UniProtKB/Swiss-Prot annotation:
It is found in: Cell membrane. This is NADH-quinone oxidoreductase subunit C. The lineage of its organism: Bacteria, Thermotogati, Deinococcota, Deinococci, Deinococcales. Residues 202-213 have a biased composition (Basic and acidic residues). It comes from Deinococcus radiodurans (strain ATCC 13939 / DSM 20539 / JCM 16871 / CCUG 27074 / LMG 4051 / NBRC 15346 / NCIMB 9279 / VKM B-1422 / R1). Residues 202-224 are annotated as: Disordered. Its EC number is 7.1.1.-. Belongs to the complex I 30 kDa subunit family. GO terms for molecular function: NADH dehydrogenase (ubiquinone) activity; NADH:ubiquinone reductase (non-electrogenic) activity; quinone binding.
């Protein structure tokens, strides 16, 4: 099979590659975007801009209008970093443009106990992302429709990603009402009868016989 570009002169191939590289570099340059939005760049491995907490919603709206999508929300506790920081906490928002591949981090510096506006009204993807930051760092997002824990148990005290969270072993209490298995799965654990999962207790001991391998039993009417 002949390569599609086999008949092209080598100089043309080099020129085409150079133009493609230049266009890609230009498309990823966010300096003009920062100038349009009136943002100042901050040091970072990826293009990063500082945003005042009171300007976050307006900046996010401007980015959404330009076609940017929200990829991630990250909370950081800088309180014990050796280098001085403007505030002990920060929330970083990773946004990207799906067509020209520009990517930008917005960093909002926050003091202890300071809240920041939720971006859920602008990007629905902020829902679980902000809940995760709230759960692990305790940063609250004003205007979030359902700000509650999403990863840690409800009765866990503190926020695991804060620098003041105590290190060491935390006992896990498997008590009734905290980790509640479905009743059908519990029935399967006994080995006496199959639950809706098709699980049998013998398999738990490694006794996997051919007659034990059965398809899952579905609820009446099929999957729910």
């Amino acid at each position: 099979m002949t390569a599609p570009d086999a008949g092209l002169p080598e100089t043309n191939l080099r020129d085409t590659a150079a133009r493609s590289t230049r266009r890609l570099a230009e498309s990823r340059d966010v300096a003009p975007l920062l100038a349009e939005l009136g943002l100042s760049a901050e040091e970072g491995l990826q293009p990063t801009a500082a945003v005042e907490a009171g300007e976050l919603l307006h900046t996010a709206q401007q980015l959404r209008a330009r076609g940017f999508m929200l990829l991630d929300v990250i909370g950081v506790d800088y309180s014990r970093y050796t280098a001085p920081r403007p505030q002990p906490f920060a929330v970083l928002y990773s946004v990207a443009h799906p067509r020209d591949h520009r990517r930008l981090f917005l960093r909002v510096w926050l003091s202890e106990g300071e809240a920041v506006d939720s971006l859920f009204p602008i990007w629905k993807a902020a829902n679980y992302l902000e809940r995760e930051v709230y759960d692990l760092l305790g940063i609250e997002f004003t205007g979030h429709p359902d700000l509650r824990k999403v990863l840690t148990p409800d009765d866990l005290e503190g926020h695991p990603l804060r620098k003041d969270f105590p290190l060491g072993e935390t006992p896990t209490l498997f008590r009734e009402g905290r980790f509640l298995d479905p009743a059908a799965f519990r029935a399967g654990l006994s080995g006496q009868q199959r639950g809706l999962t098709g699980y049998r207790g013998e398999m738990r001991r490694g006794e996997r016989r051919r007659e034990d391998i059965v398809p899952p039993l579905l609820p009446e009417g099929g999957p729910k």
